[in-house]
Regions:
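Active-site-adjacent betaalpha module
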Residues: 1-5, 33, 40, 69-183
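Conserved protein kinase catalytic core
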Residues: 16, 55, 151
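Short acidic, Gly/Ser-rich segments with clustered Asp/Glu that frequently serve as metal-coordination loops
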Residues: 12-18
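N-terminal nucleotide-binding beta1-loop-alpha1 segment
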Residues: 5-11
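A short alpha/beta connector and helix-capping loop motif
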Residues: 2-4, 19-51
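Acidic/polar short surface loop at catalytic or gating sites that assists cofactor/ion binding
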Residues: 54-73
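Short, glycine/acidic-enriched loop or turn micro-motifs at the edges of active sites
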Residues: 13, 52, 148
């Protein structure tokens, strides 16, 4: 079994649906990576969901003016986990922010454990979560081939930025991470 706590960021219909303004082109690749990781983490898995706030405040007002389709309640279909994860083995943390390093997630991971991140989108919610957790002193591993971005260039740039935070944040792959656990 792999050490750490796997957090699967925002694997939701709004990012999976090719017709969505927020479609993630390599979503299926991220799904395949996440599915490969799940057995190694057993009950140490948390899924997250990005949700719109009931009433946007501050800079979020301008954000939702640009993306008005997203101002839907938490039970709207676009916010559901995609079909591959509709019945998640782990628990679900909801947040109206890009970063998912909430007190609830921090309590699940624990102060001395490492956080393993997968999901979408690499340059937004994954990056925001990784940096906040690293600032809190948590070791973070980002599984590159279990993540996807808005496009390949943004995905790669985000991974390069996170790699600058070594040793607090380390970019790895599914195979490398699972090999660390041994036979």
């Amino acid at each position: 079994m792999t050490a750490g706590h796997l957090t699967v960021i925002d694997m939701q219909r709004v990012f999976a649906d090719p017709a969505s303004p927020w479609a993630t082109p390599r979503y299926a690749d991220a799904v395949a990576g996440v599915r490969s990781l799940l057995p190694a983490f057993a009950d140490r898995v948390t899924f997250t969901r990005f949700l719109a706030p009931a009433t946007p405040a501050g800079a979020w007002r301008a954000y939702y003016e640009a993306w008005p389709f997203a101002l839907q309640p938490p039970d709207a279909e676009l916010w559901h986990l995609s079909d591959e994860f509709a019945d998640p083995a782990g628990q679900v943390v909801d947040a109206t922010t890009f970063g998912k390093w909430t007190p609830e997630l921090a309590a699940r991971v624990g102060p001395e454990d490492r956080l393993v991140l997968a999901g979408v989108s690499t340059e937004c919610c994954v990056l925001s979560t990784a940096l906040a957790a690293a600032d809190a002193g948590t070791e973070v591993l980002v599984v590159a081939d279990a993540c996807a971005g808005a496009d390949d260039d943004s995905h790669l740039k985000a991974l390069q930025i996170m790699e600058l935070y070594r040793p607090l944040v380390r970019v790895t792959t599914v195979d490398e991470l699972l090999a660390e656990a041994g036979p």
